[in-house]
Amino acid sequence: NRDNMQLYGYGRATTPRLLDMQRRHPEEMLVLRHAWSADASTLPSLNNLFGFGEPDAAQAQHLIAMARTAGYKVWWMSNHDDIAVEQQHARLANVVDMVNRTPGRASASLDGELLDCIQEALADPAERKFIIVHLLGAHPHYRLRFPKGENPFDDEVDSVETQMVTQQRSALVRRHRQEYDAALLYHDFVVAESLRVTQLDAKAQERRAWVYLSDHGQEAGPGENRAGHSPGTEAGYRIPTIVWTNHSRPAASTDVAQRPFRADWAGWTVADILGLDWQGEMPERNVLNPQYRWQPPNLPVQVKSFTD
């Protein structure tokens, strides 16, 4: 949930590395302030992302298949064990690295295990590379998503804790919030490091880009007295989205950063960054395109404002 990220104004220091990178290179790093998922769980969100928001259409396209047709070597690397995701998406890649084979919430595999895989892919001599990294992120159980003993928010009475007490959130939910925020702090390390290694050692005139977004959000106490997946509240759909590229300057326009964005349209933006060109292209769904035209997704919750 972007509301728990310091980069988006949260009161706890959950994203110090990303915030520092954005402050040092604001002209290269675009933070979309109003990003939404159209789904509150992983599989439908990924189906929409890679299927351009229409995965069940008669002439449905798949982003990975299109990239391979265009000459890209595609990697799928994941710390998220899910047989459906593997069968519907990962198997389309040229190279598949699955570092976690423990399904469900009990896995204690940390996302940092993927950093070596990213560096190996970046070092590959292929001329065109499309590297997809699927993290566990801050999925429950939150206490398993960061190294043991690395929770700086544990039992800290700060403004966030005080507000939750005022909201009469239970001790269990307050503990889950502490663990969720600690998971996001570790997530910040992994995500920022993936960006850092992408930025390193680029050859002259080599085009590189990096896109980060979540498949869905989480409820961790702001809307209801509970924590976890949340298809029934806004928190389940409020996500972060960041774009970095070394060959253009999308962040130069404040207008782009303030545009509402939906993850089921992300395929159009990634396809544009990859330089894919095909008859079914819809620039009005590409948030980086001047022709972009926002349409609210049909969510099962009432949203007061998509630009809040």
What are these language model-derived features?
Residues N1, Y212-G217:
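DG-centered beta-turn motif at the end of beta-strands
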Residues L18, Q22, V133, K148-E150, ...:
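Proline/Glycine/Serine-rich low-complexity intrinsically disordered segments
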Residues H134, H139-P140, H216, R226-H229:
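Histidine-centered active-site/metal-ligand motif
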Residues A65, R196-E206, Q218-G221, H229-G232, ...:
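Membrane-interface soluble catalytic domains
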Residues D116-Q119, D158-W210, F261, W265-G267:
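A long, amphipathic alpha-helix that forms part
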